Regions:
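Membrane-proximal, glycine/serine-rich, low-complexity loop/turn segments characteristic
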Residues: 33-277, 281-348, 352-357, 361-366, ...
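Exposed, low-structure sequence patches enriched in small/polar residues
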Residues: 226, 260-310, 314, 318, ...
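A generic structural signal for short coil/turn motifs at secondary-structure boundaries
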Residues: 25, 164, 196-200, 522-524, ...
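Low-complexity, intrinsically disordered/propeptide-like segments
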Residues: 4, 21-29, 326, 342, ...
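Bacterial Sec-dependent N-terminal signal peptides
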Residues: 1-37, 739, 746, 751, ...
């Protein structure tokens, strides 16, 4: 026990020291800077940031970027920057609150922030088996965090709510970001989701605190991320009988929504997750004069205009002062002063007539003002003639890159009671892990990855059309698993070493691409290979352009650690003999803005696919023999995906559609619905020219299939194995009616979700029904101040 306490204390101490060092990396260069004139914040050439590279127009057509606000994300290998759009769009704001996704593309257990899995199988991650994977609605991965650079501090408050204190949902987000100077900025985000649940034993309480900082200097760049998540999900195992939803008239008793019997009670999943990222680089290069960006030219023109107006105002004020002195109209009586030594009756020789004096001084003042105005106009003309708009810029040629990522996770599954004969197996575990008949399955792990790279950057010379990087990476991971009552628990350490390279082209308007390769040379993952490539081509057609996006990868990977080893009271496996799984993916998408059409095609091929299977018996709503285990298919499995997006507008009427077709060669191993459909019909107009309104209804639908079932004890979705109790879901439309508003920087909505409830099979996961008809409201307010 002492050793265990000592280990926990040491881990906390290391985390504090680690966090302090990361903050120091950011603070030292930031404190060395002064507060100079602030422009767009991207005056330094960086081959990884391409402001000319357009985002998908169909995805960003509703986004209006505030002036002076720039956002970007970083990748997990090198910290390369990619422009990002701010989350300020009115369009589909009301759907951002759903765990099922904006377009209903996720299967979920039903509650706010509850476990979910992508129904479009090509979008899943098949290499991970973490306990937080199913909570992707709430957890923001480091590669999706938006860094900010703004002319003024940014504050955003978002809140949505439904129901009451017994069964409602509340979600609060608060974000703040500010720049210290033109190079350095930081921000933080607080996120709290509390879903009490409309069914028994279903509540979720999710907390996230994330802070970040960035420093973009001429030679040194750094990005820092810290995040901590505390996640608690109450597990009910689903309802005992689906007929309470599908055929309530066939049951012997009638239940309200919160009275429907569920399988489990007093069962919880609890996870604490800490993440830290430090991505920094030192650039070596030279200075040269380059054209300013449109934003910089606009800022420079604004500064020149302000200076001219100031000088003109000063000249006018000086001329008016001289004119007033000449005419004697000073606006206030002057106090007469008596000069000592001058006799009272003394006279000035040669006094001029007062009218002549006023005329002469007035003429002189007007001539002076005219000369000053002519001078200002000459400056204006010279500025207008100067169209070069150049600046001196530091151009990096070579970058020395270091990227550090640290994750520490603690996961516990707790059960105070379980149904009789519910589990098929029972294993011997440490006494402090499970007392008597209760369950206290503990698993924790940490992962530390260091990547060192040298990059030759594109853009410093016209004869170098691309950038290139080479890197080495080391990864150390420690997994803590339960053992028998004598050994108690074990720590399993895995070290891996890999090398790789990248070719990248982000500059220009026609062609962009990025190819990354990595090979593992030592450790448990020796022999693993990952090759990822993506690119886009812009082709002009009929005074418009078509954007063709291409993506492909080849992954030969060792199964994740928890797919190979897992120990708990009722689930236990050690699969050292699993083969490497091969995943090949080819994807292409085409977007034509003129017709508002988008097409997507994807092909996936799996060999030795590793997956989780679940099996049990069900008799008169009683479940027995519940078990789950890792399986590997020796088959060659193919998955074909075709998606179509088409939008229409007729006056104030808008109609948006997304259709996805999927076909898998073996639905017993990789089950997918053949058809997914989302449609949105709404009126778009303004009230009093200031209040933008979207009023309409949307619907999500998918064809019935044997969907993966949720296994709460493992926080994973699993393929249904027992043909006698296999359950289909789908073939049911879910319709929402909404009114979505935008008033300046304030977005708000009112909605009646699932207006057609009570009419059928409303499950998005087997045995986990969706909420019935619910009135919802939400608000998001952004302040730049």
């Amino acid at each position: 026990m002492c050793a265990e306490v000592y280990e926990v204390k040491m881990k906390k101490t290391y985390s504090i020291i680690f966090a302090s060092l990361l903050l120091l990396f950011l603070a030292i260069p930031a404190m060395a800077q002064d507060n100079t004139f602030y422009d767009d914040g991207f005056s330094v050439t960086d081959n990884t940031f391409n402001p000319n590279r357009a985002l998908d127009s169909l995805k960003t057509k509703h986004v209006k970027v505030p002036k002076g606000l720039y956002l970007w994300t970083i990748d997990d290998h090198f910290g390369d920057r990619t422009t990002a759009a701010p989350d300020t769009a009115q369009h589909l704001f009301m759907n951002s609150i759903f765990t099922t996704g904006r377009y209903g593309e996720y299967n979920t257990t039903g509650n706010l922030g509850a476990p979910r899995i992508a129904r479009i199988a090509t979008d899943r991650d098949y290499t991970s088996f973490g306990f937080t994977d199913v909570l992707s609605y709430f957890i923001t991965p480091p590669t999706a965090l938006r860094f900010t650079n703004a002319l003024s501090p940014i504050t955003n408050l978002s809140f949505n709510s439904c129901g009451d204190r017994t069964n409602g949902e509340d979600h609060l987000k608060a974000l703040f970001a500010v720049n210290i100077n033109r190079e350095a900025g930081f921000g933080f985000k607080f996120d709290y989701a509390y879903g009490r649940g409309y069914y028994q034993n279903q509540s979720t309480a999710l907390f996230d605190y994330t802070m970040w900082g960035s420093y973009i200097g001429q030679r040194y760049n750094a990005h820092v991320i810290f995040s901590f998540d505390h996640l608690k999900v109450t597990e009910n195992g689903g309802i005992t009988n689906d007929e309470y939803i599908t055929h309530p008239e066939a049951t012997s008793e009638t239940y309200s929504e919160n009275e429907i019997p569920v399988v489990l009670s007093s069962n919880w999943n609890r996870t604490n997750a800490f993440h830290a990222t430090l991505a920094h680089r030192y650039n070596v290069g030279f200075y040269r004069k380059v054209p300013m960006t449109e934003q910089e030219i606009e800022a420079r023109r604004f500064a020149i205009k302000a200076q001219k107006e100031k000088e003109a105002a000063e000249a006018a004020a000086e001329a008016e002062k001289m004119l007033a002195g000449a005419t004697g109209n000073t606006g206030a009586p002057k106090q007469s002063k008596r000069l000592s030594g001058r006799p009272d009756d003394a006279m000035i020789v040669g006094d001029l007539n007062n009218d002549s004096l006023r005329t002469a001084l007035k003429k002189a003042a007007e001539e002076r003002r005219k000369l000053l105005m002519d001078s200002l106009m000459a400056k204006k003309d010279s500025v207008a003639i100067d169209t070069s708009w150049t600046k001196e810029e530091y151009v990096p040629v070579t970058s020395f890159i270091h990227n550090l990522q640290f994750d520490d996770n603690w996961h516990t599954y707790i059960a105070y009671q379980s149904p009789t004969n519910f589990y098929q197996n029972k294993y011997s575990v440490p006494v402090d892990f499970a007392r008597r008949d209760s369950i206290n399955d503990k698993t924790d792990y940490f992962n530390l990855r260091n990547t060192f790279a040298i990059g030759l950057l594109e853009g410093f010379n016209k004869y170098v059309p691309m950038g290139a990087k080479v890197f080495i990476a080391h990864n150390i991971a420690n997994y803590r698993l339960a053992e028998d009552s004598l050994t108690r628990y074990s720590n399993n350490v895995e070290n891996t070493f890999s090398v790789g390279g990248q070719l990248i082209k982000t500059l220009g308007n026609t062609l962009h691409y990025k190819v990354l390769g990595e090979v593992w040379l030592a450790g448990k993952q020796v022999g693993d290979v990952k090759i990822d490539g993506e690119g886009d081509i812009r082709v002009p057609i009929l005074k418009d352009s078509v954007v063709l996006n291409l993506k492909a990868f080849y992954h030969l990977t060792t199964p994740a650690y928890f797919q190979r080893h897992y120990h708990s009271k009722h689930f236990w496996w050690d699969h050292d003999g699993l083969n490497k799984q091969m995943h090949t993916h080819v994807e292409g998408s085409l977007a034509y803005t003129k017709t508002r059409t988008s097409l997507r095609f994807a092909y996936d091929n799996f060999q030795n696919l590793v997956y989780l299977g679940v099996s049990y018996d069900r008799n008169n709503s009683v479940i027995t023999g519940y078990t789950a285990d890792i399986m590997q298919s020796s088959k060659n499995i193919s998955l074909l995906t075709l998606a179509i997006q088409q939008d229409f507008t007729l006056g104030i009427l808008n109609w948006e559609n997304r259709i996805t077709f999927q076909k898998c060669s073996d639905n017993n191993i990789l089950p997918v619905p053949d058809f997914n459909f989302w449609t949105n019909l709404y009126l778009k107009f303004k009230i009093a020219r200031v209040l933008a309104v979207h009023f309409g209804a949307d619907m999500r639908y998918f064809k019935s299939y044997y969907a993966p079932e949720y296994v709460p004890q493992l926080s994973q979705f699993a393929v249904q194995q027992n043909d006698n109790v296999k359950t289909k879901i789908g073939n049911y439309p879910v319709i929402d009616v909404y009114a979505n508003f935008l008033l300046k920087r304030c977005r708000f909505f009112v909605m009646m979700s699932h207006v057609n409830s009570g009419t059928g099979n409303y499950f998005f996961t087997p045995h986990y029904p969706l909420n019935q008809r619910v009135f919802r409201l939400g608000l998001s307010w952004t302040v730049f101040n």
